[in-house]
Each structure stands twice: as structure tokens, then as C-alpha cells.
């Protein structure tokens, strides 16, 4: 109580307020960058459409029209292989014995060699020419020979037939032009070659220049094209052509798929990159089309994904052909995106945004003041050293920021703000509880209790959103928006606030008959706590806490515990009816606990119950702040998610009020019955 009333606390509050304004200004600038990049590119495999036409009794043009109407904007073109070139009737490739049989007059044919000829039309000749071009770079000159057979140019290749047929040659200009001719953008998917040469990289760029419809490059394999020596060169050439690199989001949604050189290339290109979501075929076959569409839609709106790479279902569904099945779920994604204010087209590339250093510096000072304020609440005797802590902290953090341009200091202060915000907010709530604890429930009544709890919830929520601005502002640059850098310490933001608010609580409310106000009191508290007799009821309670802890901690992050089906259904419902789905632990758990905590205070329920309800309130407020730690999520979406959580929590509070009223009446009824026995 004394800490909150001190002059130091008030000065720190002013410094925090100034820091919040600076962090808020950065967040608004960041929001403008995000809201200016709302075009999502839908990509599908070019050859998948070509190959499906014959087996579905459709022309290729009919299927291209089907996918165009579904919202597919771009066709993915991969490195050609000899096998694909034969399958699509561009080349003829023979084993030596077969070629000799077909050309008995030809001289010098070896059974161990491979022979390549074009299909005798303009397209075949073009593909043959490109194949010759690639083989001259990828194979030794001793292993490739060109000669005429009956007036047809022929390539003789010294290689093992089966391995050669699977050999990745490269991107073909003819394929790029063919894909673009159907009215789509083209996304190139090159792989790297061992000991890649500059000539090979230049040849790729030549193929890229074959069409002005190339919209992006998605590297495939474990390395980007040109790794290691020509990464910067290729990055520069792509930037010069204004062609972005697509980084594939990792399956666990943390960072990107492992690919040597991709992040270096992104930095070298001044962050001309887009985030791409790709679902594996193994994952897709486990889902129905509606759920698959929801996964893509949520990824786009919640994680700054601006390119979708769609796989094909394995089997057709609902009486449709396989192409119709695929087009159906892609159309669902496109429709929902457009309904949410996005456009479907060439992927937007975010501005390479870095906030003004002075604003960031002020936000850092505010976040530091928040940490110092929390220290003051936890350890009131340190109040005499508060300005020493503040000045020392400013010297260290500002020195690291301005002198070394340290990224770690930003991450540490963001973590500090995320941990300390719910602690300070709930400490203020506890201070209010202290002022009201002597009030009798008869003076309040259910109606006033609800209104009071509702006001407390919204005031607390607004303060938490203000504190969350520090996380958004301190980490608000393009590296974090693309998730090339991340918020560090997510698990700590769940656990530490609960431990810290417990320390604050035992200083304000009596456990075992007295509060903790000194070191001796704390030691006495620990001894009494360790001496508590363990009974069956306590074991049951600890079991319930263990389950809650598993759900709360285990379900956090991206690799959390599995989510049951009914909860997935609830999430999908909320996604459809609200702008941003609120978190269950906020509106079903933490926010209603405000009313229950006030009820426990006024009705003089056991102190331990009031404590656990305060912990629940802390979880709710902490979750609101932790939402902003996911920097890939747009700022506006995170902010509205918090407001939606408060709105849904207000409704849950009504349910909690009704439940408590029923419980009180039942308790009174059975208590009176028991008294008459």
C-alpha cells in the first residue's frame, strides 16, 4: 500500500505513461505498414493442373479457368527433370539399345549411353535447346556429345539411365512462358546444385526474364540457389527486378523451414520477402476441406502470411472431381479473405520498416520504469534505492541501444514489460480490494457487484493493453513483423507473473493470520506453509491445480498440448462471428474471475480461495499482454483480440454471476436443512 502511495511510484507512473505514448506511436506506424500490405497470392502447381486434365475428361484450359475462378493467382513452376520432359511429350529419351533398334543405320551407338531427341515441333525444339544448355553446365563435356541422326540433332549422354531421369536440370523458360500464357502469375521454385557456378545462377536469371509475369521465388530443398558463394549476387539481382523471396513458415509456426542461406538472402535484399504458408499433403489428408480452408485463412489474417501454396487432396470428395475438390477449398479461402478486407492478387511486400530511434529509446525508458515499479511493489524496502535502480538501468539499456545497437536489450525490455504489466495491474486491483474488504455483501448486492466487477475488468484490461504497447513498440520493426527475429521468453510470461503476484499478495493479505512484511515474516510463512497437513481434500485440490497448470502452460506456445474437437469447433465459431477470436483462458477463465474475486472478498470466503481467484485474474491479464508477443500478428488484430476478449469476458461474467447466485442459494438451503437436523 505504501509503495503505491509513494512519490516515487507516481513519478514512475508518469515515465511509464510517456513511454506508452512513444510505444503507441511506433505501433500506429507499424499498423500502417501492415494495413498497406493486404494482397494475398494463392499459388498452385502448374503441372498438377496439366496432368489432371486428361484423367478428368477436361481440357487444360477448362481446368485453368476453374482454378482462376477459385482464386488461384499464380502457378508454381519447378525444376524440370528428364522424366517430366518425356511425360509431357517435349523430348524423346532412349536407352542405347532401344535407340540403336530404332535407328539401325546410325553409327557409333553405345548400349550404355543415353540418347535424347526433341519432339518434332516448335515446342519440342525449344525444350531440347534448353536441355542442351543445362547439360553443358551440369555435366562434363566428355559426358555430353551432340550429333545428327537422320537429320535430327541428338544428344548422347554418359550416365546411369534411372538416375539421369530423376536429375533436376533447372527452370525452363518455355515452361515459364506456357504457365504465364494462361493469365496467371508465375512463381519459380528452383533448387540448388552442388558446387553451383555463377553461370548456372545467370542461366536461372535468364529463364526468369523470359516472362514479366514472374511474381516471386520460393526455393526448394535444404539450400537456396547459389548457396554459399552467390547468395548475395542472386539476392541483388532479384531485388533489382523487384521479385520477392518467399520464406516458408515452419510447421510449428516458429520461424521458417530450415534452408541454408534464406535469411542471409532476405537481409541482403533489404527484406523484400513475403511469408508463405504451405500445408503438407500428409497433413491435408487428415482434414476436411472446410478445416483446411480455415487453416489457410487464419494463417493469412493472424500471421502476416501473404502467399499460400496449396497442395492437392489425395482423393476427390463429395461427388466432385479431384480438381473441383481442390478448387472448392481454395475458393473458400479466397472468399473469406475478401470478406475480411484482403485482396487476392500478387503478394504484398511489407515496407522495410524500422521505427525512429528516438521513439524506441523513449519506449525503452518507459519499459524500464515499469520494471522498476514492479520491483518497488515486490520489495518495498528498495524504495530508497529506486532512483539508483532507474538511473543505472537507463545507463545500461540506453548505452547498449545507442552504442552497440543491441537487439537483445530490446528483447529483454519487451520480456520485462510482458511480465511486469499484469503484475502491476493486478497489484492495483489488490490495492482496491484492500480498501473494500471491510464492506459487507449486504451493502453491495448482486447488481452493484456486477457493475463494479465489470468496471474493474475493463479498467484493468485497458491498462494491460497500454502495457502491451511496450512489447509492440520495442519489437516493432520488419525483422519481427516477418518473424526473422522473435520475442524471447514466452513461457516466462506465463509463469513469472503468477509467482510475482503471489509475493505481492502475501504482503497485502494475511495467510496463517498475518501478512508478510519482512524477511522474518517470509521465513515464518514458508515454515508454516511447509508444515501444512496434507489431507485428501488438499491432494484433490493439488490434482486440479496440476490439470489447470498443464492446460495453462502446456497449451501455451506453438507446440502445446493437443486441442480437443469441441474446442476447435468453438474456435471456428468465434472466428466466424468476431473480428479476432479471443483466447479461452481470458474470457472463460481470467476475466470472470474478477467478479468471483470480488464476491470472495465481500462474502468473506476463505483467503486461499480469494488468492487462487487473483491468480486466475493475473492469468487473464497476462494473456492479453502475451498476445502482442506474437509479432507476426498484425497490431490491430492483437488489439481487437484483447477488446473482443473483454467483451466475451463480460458475457462470461454474467454466467459466473448467475452460477454464484445459484451456488449461494443452494448452500443456504442445505445449510438451513442441516441446522434443523
Predicted regions and their residues:
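Alpha-helical transmembrane segments of integral membrane proteins
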Residues: 2-22, 365-677
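Soluble extramembrane regions of membrane proteins in the secretory/endomembrane system
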Residues: 31-357
